[in-house]
Amino acid sequence: MSIIADRNTRLMFQGITGKEGSYHARLCAEYGSNVVAGVTPGKGGQTTVQDVPVFDTVGQAVEATGANMSLIFVPPPFAADAIVEASDAGVPTIACIAEGIPVSDMVKVVHYLEGTETRLIGPNCPGLISPVEKVKAGIMPGHIHKPGRIGVVSRSGTLTYEAVGQLTGMGIGQSTCVGIGGDPLSGTSFIDVLEMFESDPDTDGVVMIGEIGGSREQDAAEYVKEHFNKPLAVLIVGQSAPPGRRMGHAGAIITGRAARAEEKIK
């Protein structure tokens, strides 16, 4: 069993005809994911990698293929509209891989999604993978993962890969690995993922990786105190980061005492 996506998930790629979209659609399909559709306005009727059909709109793709999860690979200026289009078409789960979306756009998106049933993962995230279910909905390297019973949730994509690589190297497999993204405004939170892992009978423990910026780690700590009953290992990175300097992610910046690594570790 996995959380968020499983072997029955029907994946759609918005921006599938672009270089990154087509490349990762192929890798996801090769891993075992059920990639059923792509969307690029003006290119409907074509086929792309693995003979996946391309549609002009998300609505057309959903109607024709039953796609129920979308990965967004469109350029940052158009990513917010792509998220809203997928939500309007009734897609229940969206993982926005795109990086560099204007904060003003995400303010509108987050507000818009509050009144919907859509789950947004990201933006600026690697997506998710379940080695148990052989489903990859994102950009993480599939070969480093091993089926098992440890969940992983992280703000950082590359640190997720590092943690997973070490777990696999020690013979410890993973149930589901979720990258929630490093932007200041995002959808699914640490708490959301921890709640799902808590309810998942096939996850025995969790590795959580946080970083400087914001207060999501502190919020998760408060949740864990009262509601999380499984073993949890937490890594907070950025202890040497200088205040006011962005460290990779748009949200990885110390703007106050609570955003510092040492405060999160407390």
Give the role of each language-model region.
Residues 1-266:
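Catalytic-core regions of core metabolic enzymes
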